[in-house]
């Protein structure tokens, strides 16, 4: 098999989740979870073919160290040369982004601009993104924004009942969260029911913390 695979990364302030997927079937070939990043006892756990093993990251306990360990794991299984692109979850794209986008310097600057809207998450996403650009040189990186799904809200839904100048001056408005999850659930529900998504009326509950 030589088809290209997709690597997806979800970086938190002290963690990194990753998976390698077959772009056609959606099958997860390898997954990983790095924990306690930026602490002396950082480590990353890999799962491949149903088996798990842990790699110590204490020598380089940051996001870059985790991505480097991931690259070594991919090489060990002959998957590194089959990665065709990298996808990144980013919590907030603010009003700048309403869809997924190919990463360039302008996009990185845009994510930085949105840090005040997600001060815990966006800096961590940028660390993982920059590490991926350095370690997986030449591969396209795409960011998927959690806020993008909710950018379809009409103006009366995303604006609060406060003076308009607060929106104009401070950008005070409603942003939805976990939009990537909601998009998946709504798409799968439409597929399961055999209906067009725009014809559905659904209440969706996001359970969990990620």
What are the functions of these language-model segments?
Residues 15-60:
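Short glycine-rich, Thr/Ser-proximal phosphate-binding strand/loop in the N-terminal lobe
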Residues 11-16, 210:
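Ser/Thr-glycine-rich phosphate-binding loops at phosphate-binding pockets of nucleotides
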């Amino acid at each position: 098999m030589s088809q290209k695979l997709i690597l997806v990364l979800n970086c938190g302030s002290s963690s990194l989740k990753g998976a390698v997927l077959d772009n056609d079937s959606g099958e997860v070939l390898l997954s990983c979870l790095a924990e306690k990043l930026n602490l002396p006892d950082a480590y990353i756990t890999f799962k491949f073919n149903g088996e798990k093993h842990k790699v110590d990251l204490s020598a380089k306990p940051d996001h870059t160290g985790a991505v480097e360990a991931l690259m070594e794991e991919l090489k060990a299984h002959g998957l590194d040369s089959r990665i065709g692109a990298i996808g990144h979850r980013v919590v907030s794209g603010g009003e700048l982004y309403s869809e997924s986008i190919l990463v360039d310097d302008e996009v990185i600057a845009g994510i930085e601009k949105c840090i005040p809207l997600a001060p815990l998450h966006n800096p961590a996403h940028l660390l993982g993104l920059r590490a991926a650009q350095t370690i997986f040189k030449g591969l396209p990186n795409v960011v998927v924004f959690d806020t993008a799904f909710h950018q379809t809200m009409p103006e009366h839904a995303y604006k609060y009942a406060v003076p308009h100048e607060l929106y104009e001056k401070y950008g005070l408005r409603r942003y939805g969260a976990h939009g990537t999850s909601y998009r998946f659930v709504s798409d799968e529900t439409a597929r399961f029911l055999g209906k067009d998504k725009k014809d559905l009326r659904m209440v969706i509950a996001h359970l969990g913390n990620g």
